[in-house]
């Protein structure tokens, strides 16, 4: 047992806390993972104390040695908190005092509080993991873009309300998911820029420090571009946690939309994709089954990520300034969100990268469900018919086909003319899937030339994101 109980308070109290309070307060079972960040903060704080004339050269050297020794033991897996330790901060101070003695080790706490300490190191932790998650999202974008590139000009039925709508390129559909995921990466970058400018170190418990410390210097040493403008805000705000939790939840939602499509497309009724054996599972009783477990888990974990966000927001609601112990509850939900995404995204990327698309079946289904009706209406517009009338005429064509049990292209010239004199034989030029997709050649459209441009644009953006991530 060390020379400190692992608690950073006590002089004002005649006795120790009850065992029940100890059990409730203890957080080392989840915040111990912050040890490397706490040690980095302590090194920066020791340097600030030295610059302020509060540590001798010898004291600074000994503190650095002790902190490095603890870091080596943590990396080796031999550094452990004691049951008496309240949190990671108290545990590490106790262990540091054991390492360098109370005369030197006891000097490190000057000028800092757990309040500014945890707010800062939590930001550094989340910034590191934001970069990891962003890289994994980009890997998923690469997998989707690779499938889009391989699909070429293959077509599929585009859907709204899950009903046949208009033919689109398979690549166009896959790239739609890429753009949503790239916005998630943009959100992580935006979040990081805000967090980087706001290091809480130096805020103390809430009012700042009287010891002449250098918050900007500590901020720079820890990778921040600036320090908190308001010490109360620096210690009490957790919007950076909530915003991070939102982005992780949005990533989960975006992945779940892809997952739902994979689940549907892999059914016999759709038959659009075949799952690779390595990325699917079987049944304990039904020998024929090939289950999309990764996609289903992605769909389920999206709910978990949303739950973490909503629980965190409920914790933060109506907290008065400044720090409150409620904020101990801010870490577990976000730790869980980080862990969830960092295990989910690589698995989901593997699933997507190995999907085998049945492009022949997709092409067969692309014109069905009267998906070329909009092309008929737009052809009429180009022939001078007002769209309101053109819409009615195209709808009448669909109704006639339903009565006859045929598709639009199966109507004869005479049947078209019976529906409307404006439907001359020239309408047949738009009654093909290839003609339909090629005609939609405005920016963002599904025409093959535009999709190729889109893919090139997206690839450049991904490369730019990777360069910034290093």
From Swiss-Prot:
GO molecular function, a single term: argininosuccinate lyase activity
Enzyme class: lyase
Record key words, sorted: Amino-acid biosynthesis, Arginine biosynthesis, Cytoplasm, Lyase
Pathway: Amino-acid biosynthesis; L-arginine biosynthesis; L-arginine from L-ornithine and carbamoyl phosphate: step 3/3
Subcellular location: Cytoplasm
Pfam families given in the database record: ASL_C2, Lyase_1
Biological processes annotated in GO: arginine biosynthetic process via ornithine; L-arginine biosynthetic process
InterPro entries: Arg_succ_lyase_C, Argininosuccinate_lyase, Fumarase/histidase_N, Fumarate_lyase_CS, Fumarate_lyase_fam, Fumarate_lyase_N, L-Aspartase-like
Primary localization class, coarse: cytoplasm
PROSITE patterns named in the record: FUMARATE_LYASES
EC number(s) per entry: 4.3.2.1
Catalytic activity: 2-(N(omega)-L-arginino)succinate = fumarate + L-arginine
Top-level taxon in the UniProt lineage: Bacteria
Keyword Amino-acid biosynthesis: yes
GO-annotated cellular components: cytosol
Entry annotated with the keyword Cytoplasm: yes
NCBIfam families: argH
Stated family: Belongs to the lyase 1 family. Argininosuccinate lyase subfamily.
Entry protein name: Argininosuccinate lyase
Gene for this chain: argH
């Amino acid at each position: 047992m060390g020379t400190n109980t692992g608690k950073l308070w006590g002089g004002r109290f005649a006795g120790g806390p009850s065992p029940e309070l100890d059990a409730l307060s203890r957080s080392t079972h989840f915040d111990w993972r912050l040890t490397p960040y706490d040690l980095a903060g302590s090194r920066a704080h020791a340097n600030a104390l030295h610059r302020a004339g509060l540590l001798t050269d010898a004291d600074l050297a000994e503190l650095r040695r002790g902190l490095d020794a603890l870091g080596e033991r943590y990396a080796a897996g031999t550094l452990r908190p004691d049951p008496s330790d309240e949190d990671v901060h108290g545990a590490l101070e106790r262990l540091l005092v054991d390492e360098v003695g109370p005369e030197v080790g006891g000097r490190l706490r000057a000028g800092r509080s757990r309040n500014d300490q945890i707010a800062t190191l939590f930001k550094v932790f989340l910034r590191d993991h934001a970069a990891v998650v962003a890289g994994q999202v980009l890997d998923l974008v690469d997998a989707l873009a690779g499938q889009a590139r391989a699909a070429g000009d293959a077509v599929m039925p585009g859907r709204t309300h899950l009903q046949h709508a208009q033919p689109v390129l398979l690549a166009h559909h896959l790239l739609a998911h890429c753009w949503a995921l790239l916005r998630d990466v943009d959100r992580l970058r935006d979040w990081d820029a805000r967090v980087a400018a706001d290091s809480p170190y130096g805020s103390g418990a809430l009012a700042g420090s009287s010891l002449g410390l250098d918050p900007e210097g500590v901020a720079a040493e820890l990778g921040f571009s600036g320090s908190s403008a308001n010490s109360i805000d620096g210690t009490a705000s957790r919007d950076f946690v909530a915003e991070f939790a939102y982005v992780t939840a949005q990533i989960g939602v975006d992945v779940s939309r892809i997952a739902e499509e994979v689940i549907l497309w892999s059914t016999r009724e759709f038959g659009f994709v075949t799952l690779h054996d390595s990325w699917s599972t079987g049944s304990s009783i039904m020998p024929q089954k090939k289950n999309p477990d990764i996609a289903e888990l992605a769909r389920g974990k999206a709910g978990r990520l949303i739950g973490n966000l909503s629980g965190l927001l409920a914790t933060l609601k109506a907290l008065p300034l400044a720090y409150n112990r409620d904020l101990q509850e801010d870490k577990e939900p976000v730790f869980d969100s980080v862990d969830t995404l960092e295990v989910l995204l690589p698995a989901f990327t593997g699933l997507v990268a190995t999907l085998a698309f049945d492009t022949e079946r997709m092409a067969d289904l692309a014109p069905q469900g009267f998906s070329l009706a909009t092309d008929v209406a737009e052809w009429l517009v180009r022939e001078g018919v007002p769209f309101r009338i053109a819409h009615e005429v195209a709808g009448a064509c669909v109704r006639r086909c339903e009565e006859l049990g045929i598709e639009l292209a199966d109507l004869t010239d005479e049947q078209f003319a019976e529906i409307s004199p404006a439907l001359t034989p020239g309408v047949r030029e738009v009654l093909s899937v290839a003609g339909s997709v090629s005609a939609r050649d405005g920016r963002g459209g599904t025409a093959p030339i535009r999709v190729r441009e889109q893919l090139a644009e997206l690839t450049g953006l991904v490369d730019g994101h990777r360069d910034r991530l290093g």
